[in-house]
Amino acid sequence: MIAVIDVSGNNLTSLTNALIRLGGHFALTHDAEEIQKASHVILPGVGTARSGMTALQQNGLIDVLRTLTQPLLGICLGMQLLLEYSEEDDIPCLGLIPGVAELLKAERNHPVPHMGWNNLHWQKTSSLQQGLNNSDYVYFVHSYALKADNYALARCQYHEEFTAVVKKGNFYGMQFHPEKSANVGMVLLNNFLSLESTC
């Protein structure tokens, strides 16, 4: 079973529809035991770092997520929450992946938030990359990003480079929305769900 963490009341229709198309058995949940028993865990996120961390704390999930051994995927804000710290609201995050979510630099031709399609530049071979290449585009909506590349699987160029896909151990992050990224996003989600679970 796939646990989709739902602590914020956000509209998760696009993500759940994508999982349905992939034939995944999933549950929207904030129950610690259900999350711990899941084969894969997805942490979506819309809003601010403070609201995201507050919601996780109020539901008693911070230590639960930190001790998971199965694959965990953070999407958009969910990826940023996996990091050590976010400049947005100056708030400590889960600390599962080294790095800081920093505000993107705005330029005349590169407004912030970064909204729209952009392509991935894969840095390391990964099971997530199977069936994909550097000509593939995905859909972004964000103002903050991980600029460091220590654990980057894929990077993206938007006036400055940032990490688009990150991995450390069983913790994965995608700064873009795979569920809104057409066929490429479906391949990425399917590749994640195909990762072996150690739960």
From Swiss-Prot:
GO terms for cellular component: cytoplasm. Pathway: Amino-acid biosynthesis; L-histidine biosynthesis; L-histidine from 5-phospho-alpha-D-ribose 1-diphosphate: step 5/9. It is found in: Cytoplasm. Residues 1-199 form the Glutamine amidotransferase type-1 domain. GO terms for molecular function: glutaminase activity; imidazoleglycerol-phosphate synthase activity; lyase activity. Its EC number is 4.3.2.10, 3.5.1.2. The keyword Cytoplasm applies. GO terms for biological process: L-histidine biosynthetic process. Keywords: Amino-acid biosynthesis, Cytoplasm, Glutamine amidotransferase, Histidine biosynthesis, Hydrolase, Lyase. It catalyses: 5-[(5-phospho-1-deoxy-D-ribulos-1-ylimino)methylamino]-1-(5-phospho-beta-D-ribosyl)imidazole-4-carboxamide + L-glutamine = D-erythro-1-(imidazol-4-yl)glycerol 3-phosphate + 5-amino-1-(5-phospho-beta-D-ribosyl)imidazole-4-carboxamide + L-glutamate + H(+); L-glutamine + H2O = L-glutamate + NH4(+). InterPro entries: Class_I_gatase-like, GATASE, Imidazole-glycPsynth_HisH. The active site is at C76 (nucleophile), H177, E179. IGPS catalyzes the conversion of PRFAR and glutamine to IGP, AICAR and glutamate. The HisH subunit provides the glutamine amidotransferase activity that produces the ammonia necessary to HisF for the synthesis of IGP and AICAR. Heterodimer of HisH and HisF. This is Imidazole glycerol phosphate synthase subunit HisH 2. It comes from Legionella pneumophila subsp. pneumophila (strain Philadelphia 1 / ATCC 33152 / DSM 7513). The gene is hisH2.
